[in-house]
């Protein structure tokens, strides 16, 4: 600032700096500085300094006052927490005074200072505060306290786009709309000079109209003049991060706004496909796919994505040098994907959104997920012993969008005291202010009068409503009267019904007496039955004696003793059951006697109840008479009420006439007042104009000011007098209207009193009616209770009858059981002898089954080898056929060349030509014969294939016959094949030799004829007729040749079709063979289990000798484990979760079943060879960062060879080629560079290997998944152990499995680790690093595991 400037200009500039919200020394910033100083100094250790203590004692009270006056968190009511992040949370709040709804974001100061390298709160505040864009969430207020920063933003009730994509399948039309809005929003941020760096659906919010706005600018960074950014940390979400941002980790990152357009491409792909393009379950997998995006970006075949959409996605997901949007937004807007007829780029915000949220209130949070309460303790700043300045980084954060203090004032007001003209102007202004105040008062009086008129109108409306209510009440009374008459008729009807019911009850009582007499007779019968049961007991005792004798006889027998003892025990049990039945019969007799006594008591009670009912009936008749008398009196009162209502109606009509008259007068008054107001307004306008004229004259002439002033004052006084008179007249009229209103109020009160009297009478009548109805209901309830009791007694009598029938049936069944027992005793001896023979037969069957199982295994192996040999032979035959076709084609080409050479010498070599044509016909006939022979061979092959398929089906039933037939068929087939091959070879050799000799002869003859001297003379003598004949013959020969060629081509097509059919049959046979192999594997595991059971039986009973330990795998119980495990469903945990499968681990296989029913049917979905296992290990959070934290301790990983897998054809796709990635070899490890944003520790030094925002450079072995710091390799530290896993990564696969608990996971891992073979599988020894092509992901995604093709089982 120049020293020549006056103090006033300096003060003006300072004032502007204090008022400017973007200034670093505005008033809020200065207040924040004072507040921060007080917070940072107000500690006991610091107050020992006198200067600090004096400062606090001077400013602490004033700062506390300012804190109370400024905005604070207590000004808002918290409705709900709608979001939570690394630095704090987002709350839905309502302002207590204005009742407006906002979204308030809380940021912890402690967390932001702790992670200062990744906290960009200043950028977030500035973008939301000063963006002034409809595509950015607006910031209204920003304030702070000692623990938090608060940002009060507009509430977006539509939720984020993640919620929308989870609720809807997004069509391409919607995707076009939302992508266009994201493009415009990012353009707004880029135009402010910022890069977002974390564009994802979570940060795209929808307002109440469904339009999109960007939020969460905590990762934004300011661009330099060249539009670039320098950063050495990889900021963003793994799925949406660009390759250039990934490369910036640990190095000198230098990139521009094109990194945001990459995220837009990922977002568009996710909307259309439903998943991100570089999805993987581990961070290593996602990062390696992003770096290898040229090969890993693919589109699914089942999604109908347009070419324009694919083109746009590919244009976004490319290298930054060629990426769309690098040269500006206009090239994105011009893309064909955004062409449509529904909206334009300029009117996009005004169009209707595809999804408009349905909101119930201004605090509707249905589009946000419910969050659990954060129960963790919040960290705060520790009490310092010296000055730290924890509050200083946040000075100036406070922001108010509508600042009112330090409002603009005219700075030139202080200069007016110097000149006399300015003093006159001030005096005039004062007078003008006074006049304006008077006008303002008059306007207030006018408003008061209008309010009084409105109140009178409101009162009149109330009176009209009350009159309407009186009419409704009168109608209700009439309806109640009609209801009372209806109830009277109902009461008479009920009385008649009660009389009928009383007669019915008398009849029922007679029936009950009859039933009681029948029950007595039934009891006597039951007593007789009990006597018969005693006879049955005597018979039972005789049977017991017989049993004892039979037992003595059975004891004498040596081998039959065991079975007869069992039968004896069974008989004793049956006898005990019979005894228990007798006891039950006795107890039932007692129950019947008790029930008889109870029925007698009930009978006496019923008699007493009947007498009481007779008395009540007489009382009811008296009550009915009283009710009839009351009804007549009520009818008279109703007539009286009708007469009173008619009077009220007349009074209401009079009041309505009075109201109409008052309304007319009110309207007239309103017209007069409006006319006067208009005239006053016109006069005011004239005065304002005159005032302006006087102001203009004041500047020219100072002398005429006083005269104009006096004239203006006189005119204003006259006008004020006129206005006062008009006001008095208006007040008089208002007084008259108020008098009329008071009269109407008096009439209203009278009518209300009458109404109250009528309503009181009505309520009394209603109470009496209610009492009568209650009495009637009580009587009806009593009657109903009596009826129910009678019904229960009748039901009990029916039950007694049923019990009698049951007792009789049981006695009959006991007698039959005795007879059966006697019959069974006789048959037991016969059964024992038969059982001995069956035992011997079973032993023979066991030995035969063991022998059969060994034969079955050997036969299955032989059949497998034979099938493989036959498949190879078929392939060889196909190749031989193709070779033969090629030789035939060459022979035809040679014949064509011969024909052309012969056409040159057609006149000279007629004889030779005819001979050659004959030879060509012979060759054609020979070719036909050969083709027919080949057809026969193909048919034989087909027959052999059909025989093979039949043999495979008959394998299970007739193993011995099949092997003999297969051997005979093979021998015959080999002999025929050898003979055919030898014959074909000899024939072809002969043909070739003859054709060669003929060719040499023809050439020699041609040479001789050409060298003859007589050739020219004979040539001239040749006739034209001979030439024509030869031409005709040549044409015929050409036609025949063409026909032969067509026939040959047809034969080739036919054979090609047959070959294709054969190949299709081979594919079907392979699939069928695959299923058979899987079923065989499951059967083998079942056989192992059965053998183990047989071994247990042999140990306990020693029935027969079993096979040797080599055949049965002596440790079968230990080698087998089974249970429920979960596999990734469709290869995507994030969208589809886990799929449960029943897993069985036998000694050789791992079997996966969809359910237990498939296990019983031996129908596995996948089989793995244990011999092909490489590695089994528990996973870490970095391997499966998409899984929930609770599931990670339960997950483990299996690595196996491609050939060790055999699965159904449900989810198969070709094996993807290994992705080329740079890796480092060290001690057998193949390390891939990666970063960990989730908890992980170094396996070498046990130090943390992760960080949320700035993780250290790390390495992970893609074989054994060992993790370590990159520094260990760079510094050549000998801390890393050699790799324990040796296999070729290109030929290996992995699978993730989820156990039910952590203990189950440990059990599965320990069991499978024991199963891993010590030597690697053949063909999978570690390859050299030079020739090895690696994949980019150490931990393959779930999708690849599910979709890989089924490998061959060993």
From Swiss-Prot:
<protein>
    <recommendedName>
        <fullName>Rho-associated protein kinase 1</fullName>
        <ecNumber>2.7.11.1</ecNumber>
    </recommendedName>
</protein>
<feature type="domain" description="RhoBD">
    <location>
        <begin position="949"/>
        <end position="1015"/>
    </location>
</feature>
<dbReference type="GO" id="GO:0050901">
    <property type="term" value="P:leukocyte tethering or rolling"/>
</dbReference>
<dbReference type="GO" id="GO:0070507">
    <property type="term" value="P:regulation of microtubule cytoskeleton organization"/>
</dbReference>
<dbReference type="GO" id="GO:0072518">
    <property type="term" value="F:Rho-dependent protein serine/threonine kinase activity"/>
</dbReference>
<dbReference type="GO" id="GO:0010494">
    <property type="term" value="C:cytoplasmic stress granule"/>
</dbReference>
<dbReference type="GO" id="GO:0090128">
    <property type="term" value="P:regulation of synapse maturation"/>
</dbReference>
<dbReference type="InterPro" id="IPR050839">
    <property type="entry name" value="Rho-assoc_Ser/Thr_Kinase"/>
</dbReference>
<feature type="site" description="Cleavage; by caspase-3">
    <location>
        <begin position="1113"/>
        <end position="1114"/>
    </location>
</feature>
<dbReference type="GO" id="GO:0051451">
    <property type="term" value="P:myoblast migration"/>
</dbReference>
<dbReference type="InterPro" id="IPR011009">
    <property type="entry name" value="Kinase-like_dom_sf"/>
</dbReference>
<dbReference type="GO" id="GO:0048598">
    <property type="term" value="P:embryonic morphogenesis"/>
</dbReference>
<dbReference type="InterPro" id="IPR037310">
    <property type="entry name" value="ROCK1_HR1"/>
</dbReference>
<feature type="region of interest" description="Auto-inhibitory">
    <location>
        <begin position="1115"/>
        <end position="1354"/>
    </location>
</feature>
<dbReference type="GO" id="GO:0051045">
    <property type="term" value="P:negative regulation of membrane protein ectodomain proteolysis"/>
</dbReference>
<feature type="region of interest" description="Disordered">
    <location>
        <begin position="1320"/>
        <end position="1354"/>
    </location>
</feature>
<feature type="zinc finger region" description="Phorbol-ester/DAG-type">
    <location>
        <begin position="1228"/>
        <end position="1281"/>
    </location>
</feature>
<dbReference type="GO" id="GO:2000145">
    <property type="term" value="P:regulation of cell motility"/>
</dbReference>
<keyword id="KW-0547">Nucleotide-binding</keyword>
<feature type="modified residue" description="Phosphoserine">
    <location>
        <position position="1108"/>
    </location>
</feature>
<dbReference type="GO" id="GO:0001726">
    <property type="term" value="C:ruffle"/>
</dbReference>
<dbReference type="GO" id="GO:0022614">
    <property type="term" value="P:membrane to membrane docking"/>
</dbReference>
<dbReference type="GO" id="GO:1903140">
    <property type="term" value="P:regulation of establishment of endothelial barrier"/>
</dbReference>
<dbReference type="GO" id="GO:0005576">
    <property type="term" value="C:extracellular region"/>
</dbReference>
<dbReference type="GO" id="GO:0005886">
    <property type="term" value="C:plasma membrane"/>
</dbReference>
<feature type="region of interest" description="SHROOM3 binding">
    <location>
        <begin position="707"/>
        <end position="946"/>
    </location>
</feature>
<keyword id="KW-0460">Magnesium</keyword>
<dbReference type="GO" id="GO:0051894">
    <property type="term" value="P:positive regulation of focal adhesion assembly"/>
</dbReference>
<keyword id="KW-0966">Cell projection</keyword>
<dbReference type="GO" id="GO:0007159">
    <property type="term" value="P:leukocyte cell-cell adhesion"/>
</dbReference>
<dbReference type="GO" id="GO:0003383">
    <property type="term" value="P:apical constriction"/>
</dbReference>
<dbReference type="GO" id="GO:1900223">
    <property type="term" value="P:positive regulation of amyloid-beta clearance"/>
</dbReference>
<keyword id="KW-0472">Membrane</keyword>
<keyword id="KW-0862">Zinc</keyword>
<dbReference type="GO" id="GO:0032091">
    <property type="term" value="P:negative regulation of protein binding"/>
</dbReference>
<dbReference type="GO" id="GO:1901888">
    <property type="term" value="P:regulation of cell junction assembly"/>
</dbReference>
<dbReference type="GO" id="GO:1990776">
    <property type="term" value="P:response to angiotensin"/>
</dbReference>
<comment type="subunit">
    <text>Homodimer. Interacts with RHOB, RHOC, MYLC2B and PTEN. Interacts with ITGB1BP1 (via N-terminus and PTB domain). Interacts with RHOA (activated by GTP), CHORDC1, DAPK3, GEM, JIP3, RHOE, PPP1R12A, PFN1, LIMK1, LIMK2 and TSG101. Interacts with FHOD1 in a Src-dependent manner. Interacts with SHROOM3.</text>
</comment>
<dbReference type="GO" id="GO:0010628">
    <property type="term" value="P:positive regulation of gene expression"/>
</dbReference>
<dbReference type="GO" id="GO:0098685">
    <property type="term" value="C:Schaffer collateral - CA1 synapse"/>
</dbReference>
<feature type="modified residue" description="N-acetylserine">
    <location>
        <position position="2"/>
    </location>
</feature>
<dbReference type="InterPro" id="IPR011072">
    <property type="entry name" value="HR1_rho-bd"/>
</dbReference>
